[in-house]
Regions:
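C-terminal helix-and-tail extensions that cap enzymatic domains
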Residues: 253, 257-264, 292-297, 322
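Extended, hydrophobic/aromatic-rich amphipathic alpha-helical segments that build helical scaffolds
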Residues: 4-20, 27-65, 95, 144, ...
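Secretory-pathway/luminal and periplasmic proteins that interact with or process carbohydrate-rich
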Residues: 47-48, 66-74, 238-244, 264-269, ...
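Elongated scaffold/linker segments in the mid-to-C-terminal portions of large proteins
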Residues: 59, 63-215, 280-324
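Surface-exposed loop/interface segments of Gram-negative outer-membrane beta-barrel transport/assembly proteins
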Residues: 108, 242, 248-251, 271
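TPR/TPR-like alpha-solenoid helical repeat scaffolds
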Residues: 76-88, 245-256, 261
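A glycine-rich, coil/turn loop motif that links secondary-structure elements
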Residues: 23-35, 78, 246-250
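Active-site-adjacent helix/loop patches that line small-molecule binding or acyl-intermediate pockets
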Residues: 261-264, 274-277, 281-284
Length: 324
């Protein structure tokens, strides 16, 4: 494991040194800032086995927050995911995949989440292959703007208003996870949107630094207070009141608040929240909190290895525990 991590780290350090700074990099291409964001994610991943990595997270996060990188939070969370909300003018984006109606990069998120009978905002039905849960929606504070695009109702193609209380509703499991804004051309473009897919944002740096400060070995009261203040910056943009430092006076309490903010801030973006829960040994706990599933077990944190890999390994490759 140490050799593998060192190999990845060396590659990213080289990239961070030789790639252009964000203000010099072409939008949609790799930059020094993106390489350092990936370093942060690598270091966070390794804190599960060595908390000393939090010191590296703290160092790199502070570097990304220096003026020379030019990152800043956007004032409007919702507009960031609407048509025209991306591009080089958006200084919160660390890396995004440019998408357009005619490619080569395509965004089919609307089709993934819209019910088959959806008919509003100039858009028609999708495939409805992804949904959210009402437990997730209800976990937000009422005035949190980040749940704006969790649609709790919609107009159907037959003119019926569908909501969570409609009998046999397509919203029975949860709201529509329309993280991207309305794009009227989706229906006529084969399901493609012109809204770019944002993978990493500056808000992640704030919350990563908050975690490093509060979870590192020997975190002081001042470290905890600073961590809470960083979380509050992200909450303020969402229209929420500040969390109280006096109520979050232990690393464990700060971590719980931090994970909730990650849950609410980055839903349906890059899928890393599952990994965050795993490295803190909280995945099963969170899954059971949502639906109390009897099938949620710790061994499922790892996927089974393909049978072909085990056969080709000729005894050297062992199946992950729980799948034998």
């Amino acid at each position: 494991r140490e050799e593998q991590v060192k190999f990845i780290e060396d590659d990213l350090l080289f990239a961070a040194e030789h790639l252009p700074m964000p203000n010099k990099a072409e939008y949609g291409r790799f930059s020094s800032g993106f390489a350092k964001m990936l370093l942060i994610r690598l270091y966070l991943h390794e804190t599960a086995v060595n908390k000393d990595y939090y010191n590296k997270v703290e160092t790199v996060a502070n570097e990304l927050m220096s003026p020379q990188y030019g990152y800043q939070l956007q004032r409007d969370y919702v507009k960031m995911f609407e048509l025209g909300g991306q591009g080089s003018a958006n200084k919160e984006i660390i890396y995004a995949l440019p998408c357009s109606y005619d490619g080569p990069g395509v965004n089919q998120w609307h089709m993934m989440v819209l019910p088959t009978d959806f008919a509003q905002g100039g858009m028609s039905g999708g495939w409805a292959t992804v949904t959210s849960t009402w437990a997730f929606y209800d976990s937000f504070e009422a005035k949190d703007v980040r749940r704006t695009k969790l649609l709790t109702s919609y107009m159907s193609s037959t003119g019926e208003q569908i909501n969570r209380n409609t009998p046999q509703s397509k919203l029975a499991m949860g709201p529509i996870a329309l993280k991207m804004g309305y794009d009227p051309r989706v229906s006529a473009s084969g399901g493609h949107s012109d809204i770019d897919l944002i993978l990493y944002r500056y808000a992640d740096v704030y919350l990563s630094l908050a975690e490093a400060l509060s979870q590192k070995t020997g975190a002081s009261g001042a470290d905890l207070a600073k961590a809470v203040s960083l979380i509050n910056v992200v909450r303020q943009r969402a229209g929420l009141d500040n969390l109280s430092v006096s109520n979050l006076n232990t690393p464990e309490k700060v971590l719980d608040a931090l994970l909730t903010e990650r849950w609410h801030e980055f839903w349906c973006e890059n899928g890393q929240f599952r990994s965050d829960l795993i490295r803190h040994h909280k995945l099963v706990q969170w899954v059971k909190k949502i639906n109390n599933s009897p099938y949620a077990e710790e061994y499922k944190e790892l996927y089974p290895l393909p049978l072909s890999a085990i056969i080709d390994g000729k005894g050297a490759v062992k199946q992950n525990a729980g799948y034998q």
